[in-house]
Amino acid sequence: MHMSKTNIEKSCGAVIFESRKKDAKVLIIRQLAGHYCFVKGHVESNETEAETALREIKEETGLVVKLDTKFSQKTHYMLSNGNEKENTYFIAYVSGGKEHMEKDELSHMYWMKPIEALGCITYDNDAEVLKQAMQYRKAPW
């Protein structure tokens, strides 16, 4: 009997805060498919997870960020093609760039209070990442 090996598709991104202030808003994107989530994208060959996150954030939002890689949360789920999806999220703080939206990927970008973001994020495991990020930052809701 032949056992097919599950392929793992890896993406990396970040929970992006507008600043390091405790009450900083968080960036939530609405993908063209209608899901509300964090910026992320596929790891390209020879990239580190951090490099992927920085590149995807710049490509999709125009923002330049500083990553805090001491915070690192992974989510896993199965895709309809039978592959496993693994997302790695860091925390990021905006440090520059000019905000613009990659229109073939996103339909909206929203800066929200974390408590509002929690209410609109599509997937529970992404909401859990936000909870962990807030705890890590010791920031009030």
Region locations from a protein language model:
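Unchanged
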Residues: 43-69, 73-129
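A short gly/proline-enriched turn/hairpin at secondary-structure junctions
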Residues: 37-41
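Conserved N-terminal beta-strand and adjoining loop/helix that marks the start
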Residues: 2-26
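A generic fold-level signal
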Residues: 7-9, 21, 31, 82-84, ...
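C-terminal alpha-helix
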Residues: 132-140
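Short, flexible turn/loop "capping" segments at secondary-structure junctions
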Residues: 29-36
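Short, glycine/serine-rich, charged loops/turns that create anion-binding
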Residues: 19-21, 33, 43
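Residue-level signal for short segments within beta-strands and strand-turn junctions
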Residues: 16-18, 30, 93-94
